[in-house]
A protein has these predicted regions:
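Gly/Ala-rich beta-loop-alpha elbow adjacent to hydrolase catalytic centers
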Residues: 198-203, 207
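N-terminal cap/lid segment of alpha/beta-hydrolase-fold proteins
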Residues: 27-80
Length: 356
């Protein structure tokens, strides 16, 4: 049962200085109303927020691991000391608080919902693989709608609904954080136009697949998208093509198999600038959407894969310990989407029509 505090919150026409405009249904700019501005980090289990949720052990989508530890813990953070941009990053991969700290420093809200992402090692094992198998599962995992015969993920267990339920909980639990801004006027969903959908590797691939279906503020794909045998990348997109951004290391195996060049071009990202090596240029990187790095990872392709997000594999200044790609992350998540580079031709050496 929802708390009285929660019900009152949803009933109010404004939340902490966030007023609805009755003439057009849009909202004014988000402003924090926090008497003690600070950084907030919040956690909640999906199964405790929404009683409709269920585990799906057949795809290792469960509430607890083999040792009984909670597996459905969701993370969120916001820094009310920083002027808010009114954008919510939904992160589709393992929680990375260092990344969330960076996002919060840009004035972004960030959450990591618990959603189905371990099916990759279980499903779509036929060879040759169907060109729609993984893409359809990704979409069902994200939406909770029936797109695949391989899985059965209902609405309460899809990323969309779990994110919505989480933000509702955050709005009640942490009103100082202004989370209610991201709820629709009627309180029935998220304002997806203000959502930045993002992830790394497998998660970035699902993020891009979801953005084909649902219009979002932007997509940030770190070391992705992958799926070189799938065709969803060339489908019509609800999210405008100029809103897709990607960043990867040249030694990442995704380049060896043409995952990245293929996905980036099929998504239309070449229409907004060339591939730019961020180690040789400064922001705004020719306003492009396709960024790479070639910093020394001692030939380690696994480190290369994870090096494009904050963490131990990332490039740091040897003296100060500061991240060398901080400007890149800021660009990826905050660069104006309407500021675009000049279109370039497709790379004919990148194999787009791949078969097993």
């Amino acid at each position: 049962m929802m708390s009285s505090r929660y019900l009152i919150l949803l009933a109010l026409p404004f939340v902490l200085g966030i007023a609805a405009n009755p003439s057009c249904g849009e909202s004014v700019a988000l402003k924090f109303n926090d008497p003690k501005p600070q950084k907030y980090q919040l956690t909640a289990r999906a199964s405790e927020i929404d009683a409709r949720t269920k585990p799906h052990s057949e795809i290792d989508f469960v509430f607890a691991n083999e040792k009984g530890a909670p597996a459905d813990v969701q993370k969120a953070s916001v820094d009310t000391q920083v002027p808010p941009r009114g954008k919510l990053v939904i992160w589709l991969m393992g929680h990375n608080q260092t990344l969330f700290d960076q996002l919060n420093s840009y004035g972004l809200h960030a959450i990591q919902p618990h959603y189905a992402n371990k099916w990759f090692a279980i499903c779509c094992k036929d060879k040759p693989i169907s060109e729609h198998c993984r893409g359809n599962i990704r979409l069902e995992a994200a939406t909770g709608q029936d797109f695949s015969d391989e899985v059965d993920i209902p609405k309460p267990d899809g990323m969309m609904e779990r994110s919505f339920q989480f933000v509702q909980w955050l709005a009640a639990e942490n009103p100082q954080g202004g989370w209610g801004y991201f709820l629709t006027k009627d309180g029935t969903g998220l304002r997806w136009e203000d959502v930045i959908i993002s992830g790394s590797s497998h998660g970035s691939t699902t993020a891009a697949r979801f953005a084909k279906f649902q219009k979002v503020s932007r997509v940030v794909a770190l070391c992705g998208p992958r799926d070189q045998f799938q065709t969803w990348q060339s489908l019509p997109s609800a999210t405008p093509e100029n809103r897709y951004f990607g960043f990867s290391h040249v030694l990442d195996s995704g380049w060896t198999a043409d995952h990245y060049c293929r996905s980036w071009e099929l998504l239309g990202m070449h229409k907004f600038g060339p591939i730019v090596n961020v180690d040789n240029q400064r922001p705004p990187f020719q306003n492009t959407r396709r960024l790479i790095t070639s910093f020394d990872v001692n030939g380690d392709d696994k480190r290369a894969h994870s090096s494009v997000q904050p963490g131990r594999s990332a490039w740091k200044d040897a003296k100060t310990g500061e991240y060398m790609h901080e400007d890149v992350w800021r660009y990826l998540y905050t660069h104006p989407v309407d500021a675009v580079g000049k279109a370039v031709p497709r790379d004919e050496s990148c194999i787009k029509n791949q078969k097993q």
